[in-house]
Structure formats: structure tokens, C-alpha cells
């Protein structure tokens, strides 16, 4: 007994669903390794990322991931983020405007702008990052990070009441994230 499907559109839809469920994004192996190393061995992650000789052949998503990882590793090692500026611009174009990664790219872009003493743009980047992160209720680590940066930015402009408010919010989020290093930093900035 043969069953005929009268609508070829249904067949196409079923094929598309099957294929889309099986397709997975492949990540560059060095990026995966750098991600694993980042928290405990940021210096090794930075060296690994700097050893990637060319981004040619990487997908735009991998290039954007590379930008965020390199910025994070440079920041954790105390290096300037200025060399990451154009890569962060790429990441901002690749990630969806409501994605957590877009917010993280805005955070690091704000740090670049602050390093260049472009405080108005840095403030805008930080606020946009917080707006995006508000849709992610459990991202306490990144929220605390942004609030800490805002506190520093307000402090540089002698806006001490606003700086204090930001540091209090940073301490709150850092305590929820259970990230002692950030919590201690935010707490010392508050006092």
C-alpha cells in the first residue's frame, strides 16, 4: 500500500526540520581551549589566543568569539584593550543586539572608549550593556562588572554619589555571582 503526500511543501518542511535539528555550529578548537583556560589561567588563554596567526578561514561567529575572548584575556592580564577595538566592532556587528555576547562586547568597547578618555561614549556603551543584561536575570557576574566600570567612570568625573550607587550595585551582583575577586574589587572601590 502506497501513501502519497499531496503537498510537496510538507515534505520540504520535514526535511528542513530534520536538517536544522542536526546542524551544530563548530567552534575553532583554540577558542574552545582558551575558554576553558580563561577563569584560572588567563595568561595561558591570552598566549594561546595571540598564537593564532590568522583569522582567515574562521566563521564570523568564531571571529566574534575570538574578539571577546581576547578582550577578556587582555583585561584579566592588565593589558590595554586598544588593540581589540576593531575586533570588538566586528563582534558588535555579528552578535544579535539582544544577545548576552553583544552586551559583553559593549562592556569591553566601553572599556576601550574609557581608555581613550571618551567618557560619553563609554557611558553609553555601559548603559546599553546593562539594558541588554536586564533580560538575563542570572548574569550577575557581567552585571557586577558593568556596574563596577560605571562606578569608576563616574568617579573619574567627580560624580561621587553616582559612583557610590554603581559600586553598591556592583557589590550586590558580585555577591550573587559568588565571584570573590570582583566583589573585593567593588567593595574596595566603594570604601
Q: Locations of the language-model features?
A:
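A "functional boundary" signal
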Residues: 21-191
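Bacterial N-terminal signal peptides
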Residues: 9-18
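Bacterial N-terminal signal peptides that target proteins for export
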Residues: 1-10
Amino acid at each position: 500500500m502506497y501513501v502519497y503526500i499531496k503537498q510537496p511543501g510538507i515534505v520540504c518542511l520535514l526535511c528542513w526540520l530534520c536538517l536544522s535539528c542536526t546542524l551544530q555550529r563548530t567552534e575553532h578548537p583554540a577558542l574552545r581551549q582558551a575558554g576553558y583556560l580563561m577563569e584560572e589561567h588567563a595568561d595561558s588563554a591570552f598566549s594561546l589566543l595571540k598564537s593564532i596567526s590568522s583569522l582567515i578561514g574562521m566563521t564570523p561567529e568564531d571571529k566574534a568569539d575570538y574578539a571577546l575572548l581576547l578582550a577578556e584575556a587582555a583585561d584579566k592580564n592588565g593589558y590595554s584593550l586598544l588593540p581589540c577595538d576593531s575586533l570588538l566592532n566586528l563582534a558588535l556587528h555579528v552578535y544579535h543586539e539582544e544577545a548576552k555576547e553583544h552586551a559583553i562586547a559593549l562592556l569591553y568597547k566601553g572599556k576601550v572608549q574609557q581608555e581613550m578618555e571618551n567618557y560619553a561614549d563609554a557611558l553609553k556603551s555601559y548603559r546599553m550593556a546593562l539594558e541588554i543584561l536586564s533580560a538575563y536575570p542570572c548574569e550577575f557576574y557581567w552585571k557586577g562588572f558593568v556596574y563596577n566600570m560605571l562606578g569608576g567612570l563616574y568617579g573619574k568625573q567627580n560624580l561621587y554619589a553616582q559612583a557610590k550607587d554603581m559600586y553598591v550595585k556592583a557589590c550586590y551582583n558580585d555577591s550573587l555571582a559568588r565571584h570573590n575577586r570582583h566583589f573585593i574589587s567593588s567593595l574596595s572601590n566603594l570604601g
